[in-house]
Regions:
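Glycan-recognition and catalytic cores of secretory/periplasmic carbohydrate-active enzymes
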Residues: 1-197
Length: 197
């Protein structure tokens, strides 16, 4: 909605009210969904990644300072909070269930501390939202998490795990954003390589 509003110059009727209501509809740690103490839900990272993107875009458009702590808390408690599990994300095609995958994700299987989605690779949708939060908040606590998730993405065989197209393309947008954040154009080169897949 925010991107549409910015592109058309017409604010959707209920957009400001939706944004105003977001904080009251988050859990006690400041993000959407169930609090998983000993696991990470891939679909939850994705949904909150989309939410972060929307909140960041709204902030950049309206400069609504009340959103910065909402963005920071969501990124910190969900993404920094799950940092210890990122290296164990199952990237091996052999570890994945065969014959699953849908644009609308649901729980596919549990491997270790990961609650995996049928929307394969949607963890990287979350990564893109978290990278946008890093760009907007400049919160250096997010930097090591960003490095871990970006490196994870760079090591995934997207065709091997049958990653969803929208998850892969969203992650590539995140890499372009990270190239801007870090000043490292090699991330753009990585996007170009994956674009050819």
């Amino acid at each position: 909605l925010v991107m549409d509003a910015r592109a058309t110059g017409r604010t959707p009727l209920y957009l400001d009210e939706i944004i105003r209501r977001v904080p009251a509809n988050l859990n006690e740690l400041g993000y959407m969904g169930t609090i998983h103490r000993d696991s990470v839900d891939e679909q939850q990272l994705s949904g909150n990644g989309w939410m972060l993107r929307g909140l960041c875009e709204y902030y950049l458009w309206k400069r609504d300072e009340k959103l910065l702590p909402v963005i920071s808390r969501m990124a910190d408690n969900l993404f920094v909070g799950g940092e210890k599990y990122y290296e164990s994300y199952p990237i091996s095609p052999e570890s994945r269930k065969k014959g699953v995958g849908a644009a609308s994700g649901s729980l596919s299987q549990i491997i270790g501390h990961w609650r995996l989605s049928t929307d394969i690779g949607c963890v990287f949708i979350g990564m893109e939202g978290m990278l946008h939060a890093l760009q907007v908040t400049k919160d250096e606590k997010l930097r090591p998490v960003a490095d871990k998730l970006v490196n994870l993405f760079l090591n995934v065989d997207l065709t091997g795990i049958k990653a969803q197209t929208h998850a892969s393309l969203t992650a590539m947008r995140g890499l372009i954003r990270y190239a801007d954040i870090t000043g490292k154009p090699e991330y753009v080169n990585e996007v170009e390589k994956r674009w050819e897949i």
